[in-house]
Amino acid sequence: MFFDREKELSKLLKIIESEPSLITFIYGPINSGKTALIQEFIRKMPDHYVAFYINLRATPITKYEDFIDILFSIEFENPIKNLKEALSLVISAGKEILGIPIPNDFLKQILSENKPKNAFLYITKLLTEVKRRGKRPILILDELQVIGDLRINGPLIYEIFNFFIHLTKEAHLSHVFTITSDSLFMERIYSEAMLQGRADYFLVDDFDEKTALNFLKSQGLTEEEANLALEYFGGKPPYLIEAIKHREELEDYCKKALAMRTRQVYSFAYGKRRIIKLLTEFKNKEEVPFTGKVTRTLEEAVKANILFVDPLNGIIKPQGRLELLAIREALRMLT
């Protein structure tokens, strides 16, 4: 559900007004509304744009062939015979096409050769033709971290970054947006020397208090009910939606949600002094400084979806309000 992200939406629409020059990395805590924002962004784009949207989490990716399958995963009744047919499909698709259309024979060739360069050359050629037809192409990859460790004659992610740099900084052919909820992956990207001066970073955080209250009240909750939901769930959109669904037993639902999350945090931290020490930093604080060093302890807490690292703003914080409360409850049980 999309609600009141006009500021973020306006910024995204402003980005595509200018010539492509930077890769835009969209990041934020889990379930903060990144994908909902990008879908609304696509809907609000002017008609002369076309977005190629690829969700890398659509199916498991364990090897290069899986990545190629998702990249070019478009199902049509009849196989695509040539570039002209692929181009026709893009032009007639409207403002969004899920995946990149490719002639069947060429797809087989790309899969047999195991050379990402050939796949990227084809995409460049297709985007060039799309632009010649008066459309402005936009490439969007959701859940980019899924391929972070994939290798094909070396790490695939570096070849992808080089390709994105070519599309934006060098050829000015297409805007490129990537989306991730993995803050460790985001920290790795932010520290990557090859991306310095070639990338921009766009934080999509949970709703602030005012927006969350307005959302809850717009869905029929009273001031008292809205404040109760906010106390437990902060501005995490999916949690707020669930709170609305459980309005009839809202207080009981909130308490049960916190109890469950507390058990998860307790189980994660039990018997681990270094984890407990890290979590103790949030006993009286909602966020702490991030020095730039990712310790094994911090990595574990982030992978467990308990903490979120924001390398751009230099902070570490719980993934959301519920996690903050659960950390504090678990600490009372552990110490």
Swiss-Prot record:
Disulfide bonds: none annotated. The lineage of its organism: Archaea, Methanobacteriati, Methanobacteriota, Thermococci, Thermococcales. PANTHER family: ATPASE DOMAIN-CONTAINING PROTEIN, DNA-BINDING PROTEIN-RELATED. ATP binds at G28, P29, I30, N31, S32, G33, K34, T35. SMART domains: AAA. Belongs to the archaeal ATPase family. This is Uncharacterized ATP-binding protein PYRAB06260. GO terms for molecular function: ATP binding; ATP hydrolysis activity. It comes from Pyrococcus abyssi (strain GE5 / Orsay).
